[in-house]
């Protein structure tokens, strides 16, 4: 007991708290005091040491709590050592395994010395790894287990749990002592005495029970403390001694293991020195040979020139340089500081691509802002490491990234994208070629993704797979693609459709196979229940299935019973150019490079030789499949010719590209002693010679483009009439002078536009003129019955009611017909954009005026004469609007635009690209021919009237059409006309002031839908000098001209804005009523709903007016004229 007291005393003396509390009791003193009290309670002084006992327990509790915290940290560290050691052991085992495999490769390549060395090092690593595993096991048993037992046993809990029974005994003692003391004092007071204190001897007998309980709990507490001290001290150190011995054994055994290789290592070092000398000598000779060849071919000058160009391409001019690892494209979110008074940070979706930064708005209906990085400068913020500024030509954008790493990524991507765009600009014409290749590759990928089954993973069915197996032509998800990579490139070669820059050669199989077709073969015999994984399956299930499917071909359809039958099927697949049949025999395990027994061919010719010999631009996918899956590209025929020799012999450069992509041996010679390059030079196959030279010098680019009949779909062009009818919202006219091309539509992909022969640049588009239209770019005839009006266009101004005849039977009226010739009512729609409209990304697809398919002859060229003009109607579909004006006005309902299927119009452009689109090149006779049109009869028999409640007036000649502003020079026959065009058959040249006042619209809005003729038939108005010039508005001639379009189908059917008129005289308040909903795209535009009234305050141009909502002057801005109609004053 004395030794226990001394241990406790030494343990406690190191604690500062103990040193600050001198009134404590040691274990030996407690034992002596308690024994004395037990033998003689009345003479004992134990009661005076009660407070010392309590102080001692408090001090011990503090020390135990500190030890508990320290031991928990020790345990955490030891566990970290154990876990990292286990990882280290696993990594060492993996290292030994791959090193052994690597050494085996050397052994198989007749290089035994190096192979044996690698295998021995692999064995050494395995043995050391085993020793380390034993050491970690000792650490777990001796240290971790001991600490776990102590912390989860005696030291379990929190501070104070251990001394709770002691505290209760102390409290009971205090309570009883206070009670007795009070009674003694009361008793003395009753006898007239005053008690100052009560000694322990007086109450020893009365307090004996409580004192014994206190002494018992004190003993229990000290016993537990003693046990804990033993476990955390002696026991733990004994286990650390055991771990020490384990460490000694580990190092001694490891040294013995390493000593076994000592002599071999010394011998190996000498051998390696000799091998290195041999290799250095070879390298020296090769270098000398290379320098000799380079000097003879004068390649030094070319390389220096190329280097200078590349240095120029990396133009910096003190610009910020980004980390190239981040690339030049990125999507994500940035915080952008607003420009308002509050300057708040707003989270915005941003993307960088092709030198353009796109910043989305908070609302999806607003078009994102696009900044050309070539005109911007990226400037990091010195004060905030996560912020940077983007300085454009007209404002500064303040951005903040989520963290510093994201900040570095955005800065690098912005800088790299700008540098890439600058490099592309410096490269000039070369960039256009690369851009067209990128467009083609993008179009092929889009076509691949549309193939049946390619919307889900080929193996597990996950949606939207983006990983391509280039040698199988299938799409997989990212999880399954990882297993494909593990199987090796001889089974499946995985590339990303989004992350990798693919060449068209890598898309040949993907374009021709597809997941459904592939699985019809490879999964034809799936058992039930199906082992095929699902998108939620784990990697083990996926790996088992994919290995069985692609390595073992376990689920494929079996059609051949013998090897000869398989070879026959292989031959037939090549001869019939059936890729799926080729995949079928591949799935059955045919040896693709076995010689084929085909009479009339070179002896020993394989399927690859035959495919190369018979290849053209439609069968490259067969060659590609054989090249990527045969395994031996150097197989020779009886005459020693490889597939490379065949490419040179038969001049097959596209096949050669596919072969060189898989890196065959290019210097194989045939029986004549010629390589493929020699044959190409002898036969002067220049392309093959260049490709083989590049491969021989190591400069061949595997991501190569091949010439192939891709047969890309152009579904975007086949837009039906019904599709267009479902788009009731009109198209706003963009305020820009750039005209719209007849073949441009937002639904046409860039590659489709490039493939159109009639595709022209924006500069060419601006040269479109009316003279080009007379060349009959788009012509359609119809003999269908007359049609009834359909409210598609915005309502037009009323005309005086006179009944007019329908058009000639051979013409197609300017109204929408169904395919059967019957008419239906449709939603009203605004006209297509005017010539000044600039297409933006926010615009919906152009509603090209559609009509029924051609049913008659389609004349082409310039052979327009009076006879054909009177009976065959020229229609110019998909072109910008034109106006035909006249002073004779007849009351018409809403003008109905004819509809021609977009695919018809666009296909006709293929034969119209040779026609002149320049007004200057069109002779005046064209206009004169077009103007010789027969006059329509004024009154038909009642039975011939169509249900259309429209009235016709004499047709104006085409020569009187107004010129398109800024495009057409004045013609000789139009030069002496006033700014406002007039009809040729009216009295000579009435002036602008002679026009009647603005027509009233409201009274005729509903008439076209009723099918009734106007109740008041009036003759056409004559021009009178009664109207004041101030009554005119730019809308009047435009709408009047739109009315006349229904009269003459030979006229271009879409109106052109007239030259801007300057209003003179007193200003008058104009009010218009909206007939469509309009959502503003720009800050200065006006948003309104159908039926609201706008007060016009000004004009920005002919197609855009300025105004505010009536009664709400704060809602103001510009609005398109085609979205409103004018109210009467």
Curated annotation (Swiss-Prot):
Tree of life domain: Eukaryota
Family matches, as Gene3D superfamilies: 1.25.40.950, Ankyrin repeat-containing domain, Arf GTPase activating protein, Arfaptin homology (AH) domain/BAR domain, Pleckstrin-homology domain (PH domain)/Phosphotyrosine-binding domain (PTB), SH3 Domains
Post-translational modification: Phosphorylated on tyrosine residues by SRC.
ANK repeats: 603-635, 639-668
Zinc finger map (C4-type): 457-480
Record-level GO BP terms: cilium assembly; positive regulation of membrane tubulation; protein localization to cilium
A GO cellular-component term linked to this record: trans-Golgi network membrane
UniProt keyword Phosphoprotein, yes or no: yes
Molecular function GO labels: GTPase activator activity; zinc ion binding
Basic and acidic residues biased stretches: 300-309, 726-737, 907-917
Domain PH, chain residue ranges per copy: 327-419
Domain notes: The PH domain most probably contributes to the phosphoinositide-dependent regulation of ADP ribosylation factors.
Function: Possesses phosphatidylinositol 4,5-bisphosphate-dependent GTPase-activating protein activity for ARF1 (ADP ribosylation factor 1) and ARF5 and a lesser activity towards ARF6. May coordinate membrane trafficking with cell growth or actin cytoskeleton remodeling by binding to both SRC and PIP2. May function as a signal transduction protein involved in the differentiation of fibroblasts into adipocytes and possibly other cell types.
Protein name in the entry: Arf-GAP with SH3 domain, ANK repeat and PH domain-containing protein 1
Organism: Bos taurus (Bovine)
Origin organism lineage: Eukaryota, Metazoa, Chordata, Craniata, Vertebrata
Gene name per UniProt: ASAP1
